[in-house]
Amino acid sequence: YIDAVPYRKNLSVRRLYSQYDFARKAEKILEKEQADMVYMILPANSLAAAGDRLKRKMNRTVLVFDILDLWPESLGGKKLQKLWPFQYWRRLRDDHLKAADLVITECHYFQKFINAKQEKTAVVYWPKEVPEGWKMEIPENEAPENQVPVPEPQTALGNAGVNTPAVIHFAYLGSINNIIDIDGIVNFLEITGKMTSVFLHVVGDGENRGLFEEKLKSRGIKAEFYGAVYEEAVKAEIFSRCMFGINMMKPGVCVGLTMKSIDYFCYGLPLVNNIPGDTWELVKQEQIGINYRPDAALKCAQELLELAQSDRLKEIKYKMQSLYMKLFAQEAAENVIRERVLPLLEGGPK
């Protein structure tokens, strides 16, 4: 283990120093190793600089960068991105990507923001293991395929028919931090709530929880906050009450896929989405929810209501779970590693 400098705030000088210190210590340890491959997960961006130096010192070592998040781009704020400290922070990553034999990104969308040759890039979506004890609900007109976890009691989706549900239950999963679009979520729920009753189930916690609760209450939106939930069975039971999963972040945040959306895919919750790139295209092409636009909020709410009234929800649930198995299950990630990473060990660095 490497001792790391502790920090409290998500965005702070102390956190940046902690990451710099970790990269420095990791580099010193790796200098003493005879490694066939160095696989570095970014951020911290300072690891990219360390990897570049190690690559030059360890000539025959294969270097792989795996970019799980773009910092500082994912923090949002166009004005912030132009400030010198943020430009320097970004260049800590970008100026050293050329040293890698392969650059893996968490989604295709990230590749628009990095300077890496296409033939030296690959996409590995963040995998989620199939939870034990759940199976895919197969529509009557579909042939059975791989087993996918869904709660057997379909209290929300299974009973959805051609009539408007008395209450539309939404799920929000994940951190309640400074980059989620609290105003967008609240506005959308308020508009939808004028057409039918709505209820929000919040699975997660964070520094903006109080603000989220206050804004929901001020608009008369009923909600229940469960805090952070780590038990898969508990999370599945909460999701079984919900009809849609909310996947919304502030405009300008550089994210193409969220971990919460992978859970929604796993449990077959159609998306209320404003995330660009990979997720936006999946929703659009596969018709697995609605892509929310603030300038067309009323139209989006009407589209959601039409979907809630339709008989397509079981079909969408099945489609989302099939996409989960194809794109986001552990096996999908392992296939990319076998096809793109392991051959580098056999042939050595390019």
Task: List the model feature ranges, each with a label.
Residues 16-26, 35-58, 64-73:
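An aromatic- and histidine-rich active-site surface loop
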Residues 17-18, 58-62, 73-95, 132:
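Nucleotide-sugar donor phosphate/pyrophosphate-binding loop at the beta->alpha transition
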Residues 24-27, 46-49, 53-57, 83-103:
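Membrane-proximal helix-turn-helix segments that form the acceptor-binding/catalytic region
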Residues 72, 86-150, 223-225:
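Donor nucleotide-sugar binding/catalytic pocket of nucleotide-sugar-dependent glycosyltransferases
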Residues 180, 226, 231-237, 245-265, ...:
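Nucleotide-sugar-dependent
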